[in-house]
C-alpha cells in the first residue's frame, strides 16, 4: 500500500467514524441511510434546509476512496446552516469501503465512477467498470437518490488535478464555482464512460452536475474556501433577484 493510500485510509476512517456516530442531530441535519456498501457500511445522506426551498443542491464528498479530501468539505458544510432558500443534500461518500481502505474502487475493485448507465462499457485495470451498469450497491444507492431527489445542482468532489471539469451543456454554474473556489475551469478530454456526472447531465439536462478536482495536497484554507464556495453558489442561484436571469 502506498503512503498516499495509507494516509487517505487513516483520514477516511476518522471521517467515517464521525459520520456513522449519528452526529447529525447535534448539527441540525437529518440523517438517513440510503444504502449499504459491499462490506455493509452505511451510505449516509444528510439533509438540511426546507424541502420546499427553491433550490436543491447535492454535494458528494467522495466516490473514489483514495480521493477523500472532499469529505472534509462535506463535514464542514454539516456544521453550519444550509444556505437560504436551499435544501442541501450531503453525501460524504458513496464509497465507504474504498475510503476505509484508501482505494479508488469499492470492495469489489469496481470504479464506481465508471459504473453508471451512460455510455458504459467494460473496462479493466484501475478503472474496472464492473460486470454491468449499476452492478454495485453503492452506485445503485446514488442512482436511486438522484432519481428520487432530482437535485438542481450536484457537485462531485474528486482529486488530485486542482481544477473544475467544465461540464457538457451550459457551463455557467461550474464557471461561477470556479471563480468562487479559485480553481481553473477546464474540459477534461477523456471519454469517462459510465461517469456519474455525465449520466446526470444526460438524464436531467435542465439541471447541472459537475466535478470539482481538488489538488492532491489540501490545506485547511482550501477546505474553508470550498465550503464557502458551495454556500455562496447556492445562495446566488436561489436568490429570486439573481436566479431569474441566471442559467444553470
Please annotate each region the language model reported:
Residues 2-13:
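Bacterial N-terminal signal peptides that target proteins for export
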Residues 11-22:
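Bacterial N-terminal signal peptides
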Residues 27-39:
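N-terminal cap/lid segment of alpha/beta-hydrolase-fold proteins
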Residues 37-38, 53-60, 67-189, 202, ...:
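Active-site/substrate-binding loop(s) of hydrolase catalytic cores
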Residues 39-47:
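A short loop-to-beta-strand scaffold at the N-terminal edge of the catalytic core in hydrolase folds
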Residues 47-51, 205:
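Active-site beta-strand termini and strand-to-loop segments that position acidic
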Residues 166, 190-248:
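Active-site-adjacent mobile loop/cap segments within catalytic or ligand-binding domains
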Amino acid at each position: 500500500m502506498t503512503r498516499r493510500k495509507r494516509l487517505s485510509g487513516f483520514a477516511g476512517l476518522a471521517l467515517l467514524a464521525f459520520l456513522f456516530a449519528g452526529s447529525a442531530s447535534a448539527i441540525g441535519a437529518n440523517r438517513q441511510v440510503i444504502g449499504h456498501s459491499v462490506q455493509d457500511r452505511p451510505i449516509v445522506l444528510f439533509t438540511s434546509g426546507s424541502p420546499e426551498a427553491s433550490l436543491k443542491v447535492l454535494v458528494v464528498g467522495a466516490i473514489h476512496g483514495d480521493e477523500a479530501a472532499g469529505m472534509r468539505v462535506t463535514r464542514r458544510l454539516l456544521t453550519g446552516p444550509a444556505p437560504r432558500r436551499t435544501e442541501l443534500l450531503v453525501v460524504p461518500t458513496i464509497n465507504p469501503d474504498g475510503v476505509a481502505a484508501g482505494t479508488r474502487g469499492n470492495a469489489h475493485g469496481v470504479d464506481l465512477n465508471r459504473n453508471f448507465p451512460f455510455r458504459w462499457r467494460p473496462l479493466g485495470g484501475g478503472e474496472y467498470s464492473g460486470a454491468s451498469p449499476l452492478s454495485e450497491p453503492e452506485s445503485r444507492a446514488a442512482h436511486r437518490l438522484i432519481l428520487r431527489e432530482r437535485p438542481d445542482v450536484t457537485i462531485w468532489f474528486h482529486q488530485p488535478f486542482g481544477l473544475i471539469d467544465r461540464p457538457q451543456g451550459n457551463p455557467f454554474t461550474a464557471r461561477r464555482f470556479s471563480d468562487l473556489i479559485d480553481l481553473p475551469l477546464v474540459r477534461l478530454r477523456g471519454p469517462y464512460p459510465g461517469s456519474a456526472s455525465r449520466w446526470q447531465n444526460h438524464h436531467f439536462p435542465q439541471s447541472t452536475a459537475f466535478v470539482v478536482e481538488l489538488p492532491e495536497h489540501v490545506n485547511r484554507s482550501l477546505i474553508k474556501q470550498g465550503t464557502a464556495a458551495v454556500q455562496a453558489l447556492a445562495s446566488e442561484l436561489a436568490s429570486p433577484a439573481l436566479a431569474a436571469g441566471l442559467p444553470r
